[in-house]
Amino acid sequence: VIKKNNWENISFVNYDCFNKETYKKINYTPNIVIISGVFELFEDNNMLENTISGVAEILDKNGAVIYTGQPWHPQLKQIALVLNSHKGHGKSWLMRRRSEKELDSLFENYNLKKEKMLIDNNGIFTVSLAELR
C-alpha cells in the first residue's frame, strides 16, 4: 500500500512484538505506535510488558501509543467453542479480557499515561491514546 500510493516517511515492520530483543533491531524512533488486537490473545501479562517496555524504549520523547482493549464480549463462550487455541494444542481458547484499569496500569508502569479513550456503543471495544511522560 505504501509503494502503491507513493507515500514517503512511512514504514511497516513485522517483528515478534512479545520478544524484548525485537526492539533492539529497530533502527528508527517512531512517534506513534499502534498496538491493536493482540493483547486479548494472551493470558500472561509478562508478554504484554515485554511489548510495552520495548515500545517505551524506542518511542520518540513526544511519542504516543494507540492501543485497543476488549473488556467485554457478549459471545465470549461461543468464540471459545469455535476457535481453537492459537498455541497449537487443539484446546478451546478463551479470550483474556482486561479491564481498562488493568490495561492502563500496564502502560503507566512504563511512563505511558492514557490521555483519551473511545468506546463503542456496546462497551465491547476500546481505543486509547497514551502519551510518553
Task: Write out the residue ranges for each language-model feature.
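Short, glycine-/aromatic-enriched active-site segment of Class I SAM-dependent methyltransferases
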Residues: L76-W93
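Short alpha-helix
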Residues: W93-N111
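S-adenosyl-L-methionine
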Residues: V1-K25
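Core SAM-dependent methyltransferase catalytic element
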Residues: Y110-R133
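A conserved beta-strand element that flanks and buttresses the S-adenosyl-L-methionine
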Residues: I34-G37
